[in-house]
Amino acid sequence: MKNCYQKAFQVFFLLSITSSLSFGQAKWKPITQQTKPWSRWWWEGNAVNPKDLTYNMETYQKAGLGGLEITPIYGVKGQEANFIDFLSPKWVEMFKYTLNEGTRLGLGIDLANASGWPFGGRWVTPEDACKNVNFKTYQLKEGEKLLELITFQQSPLLRYVLPKKTEISALKYPISKNDNLQELAIDQIKYEKPLPLQTLMAYSDKGEVMNLTDKVSAMGQLNWEAPKGNWTLYAIFQGWHGKMVERAGPGGEGDVIDHFSEKAIQHYLKEFDKAFANTDVSSMRAFFNDSYEVDDARGQSDWTDDLFKEFQQRRGYDLRNYLPNLFSKENTDLNHRVLFDYRTTIGDLILEKYTGEWAKWAHGRGKIVRNQAHGSPANTLDLYGLVDIPEIEGTDLLRIKFASSASNVLGKKLTSSESATWENEHFLSTLSDVKKALDLFMVGGVNHIFYHGTNYSPKNEAFPGWLFYAAVHFTPQNPFWKDFATLNHYVARTQAFLQDSKPNNDVLLYFPITDRLTEPSPKGLLEHFDGVTPEFNGTDFKASAQKMIDRGYGFDFISDKQIANLKTQNQQIITGGVAYKTVLLAESEQVPLETLEKLVQLAKAGATIIVHHKLPTDVPGLGNLDERRAKFKALLAQLNFVKVNAQLNQAKIGEGSFLLGEDLDELMIYAKIYRETMTDKGLQFVRKTSAKGNYYFVNNKSEQAFEGLVKLEAEANSAALYNPMTEVLGMAKVKNNEVFLQLSVGESCIIETFKTVEKGKSYPYWKASKEAEELKGTWKISFIDGGPTLPKAIETQTLGSWTNAGNAYQDFSGTALYQLNFVKPKTNAQGYWLDLGKVAESASVTLNGKYLATLLGPTYKVFVPNTLLKNQNKLAIKVTNSMANRVIALEKEGTVWQKFYNINVSARLKQNLGKDGYFTTKGWSPRASGLLEKVSLTPVEVLK
């Protein structure tokens, strides 16, 4: 079979090649606790004990994990006697034991700052709980008095996860007084109660505004007669949003805090100070905050006690004078400006009063913070910028880049990811699927992988153990755990490079949040920012970002606040200790005055600013509008554009210039910004700066194997090549700044470039010298690990799914050993590709007693040196399938494995939803398992 290749071989090639050896300039970096992948570690019901904690942690450590983030969540039914309340003395004792074991085993420990998410719990009072705004309007004419009492009765609301009828009238107030919150699994609750009046404002048809709040009695009676004109009265009442902590464990159930209130977060965190007051938790690394999901509920948490005060201090005018504009549905410029100012104030409060206070609290206790900012009604770039480790999740590369952009722009060392959150339906995700997800994160700038996730489960718990409702199930009960270490070693080797480097991107893409904050939303007053989609669908911002991804331009997003700290040096833009070549504005309509002032200042100092399509036209917001608008127009007037060519105009200013044009590629070329053309060939990458040159992490995302030269924009007079999966390394073929690569589907490599000509052992490239030869004979298949039982061994001369052998084989999940004796091929060669064909799902290969490789897919090939083959050969392949078939069997026999409080395992796909509202495998057929196609050897020779 021609062009049958995969870079490298496993563990050895003639000489033993391991991570401890290096060839010339090619050398693996040290593996540390931090370079290894970590995992979210769910403590269900906090029902942990020292013996099983040790068992679990030792198992994780042996599999190659570097650390764990403890997130206590809902419990397991039947384990109530073992439940431990979050932050109780017993819980702190178990946490301290875990820290000690982590130190012994070399496992780092982070802790979620809540039992579930968002921040909240039983100790959160109604005063500190998340709020919302409610309003009523009244109409009066001259001489009229309002007879109606100014009151607002909050309507009752009860949303819960469990399909169980619960009457709100049976629940005590406040919610923390109820003892059965674990069973109730309440998601949101609003009690029927009168709401306090915050303000009463009157607006005449002539533009007059009056504050009538002090004219309202305690009973709600307004003592006021309308003067001349027609008057509209707005009464503002502060209510309770009612959001409860999601997936909370025992002791952690309760109200979510007000994320806009400094006193709320301070009161909340005091509970942790109290719990840890007499305990040494110095070995703990970080506190963690999950994504902002306060508004995953009915309505929005859109208010706080002192919003009017904060608004006036920050925006320079009284919001109470513009309540009709804030709540209006009409699309007018004034309404949009007031809405912008309201949303900006909310964003400021989350940034300063919540995220900032949380980080300050943690730092004061010697801890760092990891934060998921996505989903917040604020500029996520700024929220990420306040924390030590920004964390992202998802499968959209543009979304991923928000967290890494903040790290890159502000000089942070680590960007983490909640990885493979729900890669496939339960029990179907493979290690190959996970690797694909991890590669995307690393291409997006992530260098600190966290799996989502791993359940604490007692050693003797029956299959499938304790599980989380939405996960790949990185747990020892999953058969793929046997091969999990292979993936973890791959991640560790890759992250060792990605952590020991600095970002190397050319473009700072301005995040035009102003345009979104100005636009009303049918969902409510707030606008949440989760990424680029769907918030920026149809915008040039999204189109330009995607084009830069597709065309191979390195870029980071940047916010207004971050632009304020940029500097120009040698015609480059400096931030976070790294240099960029330009700031790109992609058809932004409104830009803050301060941002335009800074961009002009940068250009005057020698920078190049690129504007795609058109310049911004106005400033946002209402405060001091005329003065700001005049200054804005004066700045634009300084930009005197001259046509350079049909595609491009330039305005020189000071030592630099603004470039304006329709064609993004033309603008980049004129600014001397050049793309990495490897993206044209189906390759994706991230480029980093190393001590001696650059690193490229390159992944073949296409459906075809790649072989050929790849032009690099970084200077490469020589280059080292590393395969982090196979551990093969050596000096690459380089010609005219082009590096020769061979990448199978889904395969990755690391290129290290040097500005000088470095010498060393060459990287081995292989090409097929003859056609593939099928390995024929009698295969013996023995079932060696798994369940529910170990089926009898079988023999076959034709490979196919072992589920075809009968019911016992259909029910089996685990590992089977395939053994074959074969004669050495007649064709002599320098080596051979052993191709397993299609495999379900992973395979560990041994030949003549020598371990070769563990193959995760999607390509199942391994290099065999000719010195290993004998006249008579013994091939042994351990194939591991998924959990699915055993779970299917459990359901068929009526065994109850879904025994969890709260959500109790939900379906990712609707077709897998049972009548009870839970996930089910009913209707599933057994999944194909084992070696599914012929196995072959292909003679290969060195490609010169």
What residues fall within each predicted segment?
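Exposed aromatic-hydrophobic patches
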Residues: 221-224, 738-741, 861-867
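An acidic-aromatic loop/edge-strand motif
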Residues: 117-120, 124, 139-142, 158-193, ...
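Aromatic-lined ligand-binding clefts that engage carbohydrates, nucleic acids, or primary amines
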Residues: 822-848, 855-856, 875-879
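C-terminal structured "cap/appendage" subdomains that terminate the fold
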Residues: 571, 586, 594-597, 611, ...
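Bacterial Sec-dependent N-terminal signal peptides
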Residues: 1-26
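Short aromatic-centered micro-motifs
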Residues: 202, 573, 651, 843-849
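Mature N-terminal, pre-catalytic/accessory segment of carbohydrate-active enzymes
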Residues: 22-274, 278-284, 931, 938-944
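Carbohydrate-binding surfaces of carbohydrate-active enzymes
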Residues: 38, 43, 49, 54, ...
